[in-house]
Amino acid sequence: MLPFNSCVYVLLIISLMSNCRALCRATALQGRSLCATGGPDAAFRAEHERLSAFESRPSSGSYDMRRALEPIEIETWFHIVSGETDADLVTDEMVILQLHYLQKAYEKASISYRLKGVTRHINETWARNGDDSAMKKALRRGGYSTLNVYFQTNLQPPSTTDFARWTSDGDNRHAYNSDLAPLSVLGFCTLPDPSINSSSPRSSYSKDGCNVLAKTMPGGPMTHYNRGGTAIHEIGHWNGLLHTFEGESCSEDNAGDYIADTPQQSVPTDGCPSQKDSCPDSPGLDDIHNFMDYSSDDCYASFTSNQLKRMRDMWFSMRKGK
């Protein structure tokens, strides 16, 4: 675990942020030629519908007020998984910057992340996601309410032909073609599972957590995707959010992400356009600055008010005390 002295931590963050350009080794991203999202199951959609109805009703008193104001602190573990040739890719400074960005991104939701520890492992198979189940069985810490993030230096799907099958298990993933590999993924993460309760065996949630390409951490070599935004996006899924373009349709019967204040959006955003309107007959422009779109890191800026509320409600409903 990194020793975080608060004063040193703040000074180091200021220094590192000012020198971030010097830390970044440029690697061109050629664009996401393949974006695949495993859809949420019926039980998870039903929970979103229930919470939508819950959030739209008038407040019923002190319980609702306490739930709305109670700070949420999530125990968190970072696991750095590297291959032999890139064992030094992820520095302590990159870990600190990623944690800082994580805290800032979620502070308006009164959600904070208490880093319990950082583990480091050199394993060629795990680094490329060759055996996700074995890796998580060996490395995962804590209960269902504990966030585990696996930063892998060469995160890939098992094979191009298996990608559709690989994305059909309810995880949310986004992918790209790059000069680093024929097909790589920026990250994927599990959504909360309504069937998990406080007495569920550890084996029932052994794969819970977020897998993130380590090159997307602040100071990493992935140009346009090296400010740490991928981890923010994936942890949004862990907190229960769907993509802003969920359903990829402008149809009135498409519930989208079940969030009332995210405009209807039919396609993911690539890069950072000045503006975009994929559903011109629906109110509002695409929220290209939303962490739950597929925009580049320089475009990411915020969650909506209702997304912040939904993440809190998902925590109390799906993860707290489990």
Swiss-Prot record:
Annotated catalytic residues: E234
In the Enzyme Commission scheme, what number(s) does this protein have? Answer: 3.4.24.-
Q: Which residues bind Zn(2+)?
A: H233, H237
Gene Ontology molecular functions: metal ion binding; metallopeptidase activity
Superkingdom field: Eukaryota
Q: Which SUPFAM superfamilies match?
A: Metalloproteases ('zincins'), catalytic domain
| Family affiliation | Belongs to the peptidase M43B family.
**Function statement:** Secreted metalloproteinase that allows assimilation of proteinaceous substrates. Plays a pivotal role as a pathogenicity determinant during infections and contributes to the ability of the pathogen to persist within the mammalian host.
Please state what the protein is called: Extracellular metalloprotease AFUA_1G07730
For this protein's source organism, the top of the classification is: Eukaryota, Fungi, Dikarya, Ascomycota, Pezizomycotina
